[in-house]
């Protein structure tokens, strides 16, 4: 298991409020690592990258289609995308080298998912990643 996968497992899934997580390489526009059982298709990678490429207002207005679900975007800026659908959601944090993706499901606290994902994103930024 890689250092990056261990980071995902320990800091995100370890909270018990993140269902799945992934790191996407910005430069290559490819999936780098995921948590076990969490799949991100190439079309989902493009969707997330486009969410940051657009004007944040447009992303908030249009929402986000991720893993075959339409999500309402509740936050979109240069560093973060938050989207939800009923009692599930996706949190995406941009660093220098990666998009960090985390999802939550029913029974999980979205605020814990957001906090853990943002903290890991900040850690990666400080490390130059």
UniProtKB/Swiss-Prot annotation:
Disulfide bonds: none annotated. One of its GO terms (molecular function) is actin monomer binding. Expressed in testis, in seminiferous tubules (at protein level). Expressed in spermatocytes and spermatids, but not in spermatogonium. It is found in: Cytoplasm. SMART domains: PROF. GO terms for cellular component: cell cortex. Keywords: Cytoplasm, Developmental protein, Differentiation, Lipid-binding, Spermatogenesis. Gene3D superfamilies: Dynein light chain 2a, cytoplasmic. The keyword Ribonucleoprotein does not apply. InterPro entries: PFN (IPR048278), PFN_euk (IPR005455), PFN_sf (IPR036140). One of its GO terms (biological process) is acrosome assembly. Belongs to the profilin family. Involved in male fertility. Required for manchette development and acrosome biogenesis during spermiogenesis. Binds in vitro to phospholipids, including phosphatidylinositol 3-phosphate (PtdIns(3)P), phosphatidylinositol 4,5-bisphosphate (PtdIns(4,5)P2), phosphatidylinositol 4-phosphate (PtdIns(4)P) and phosphatidic acid (PA). Contrary to other profilin family members, does not bind to actin in vitro. This is Profilin-4. The lineage of its organism: Eukaryota, Metazoa, Chordata, Craniata, Vertebrata. The gene is Pfn4.
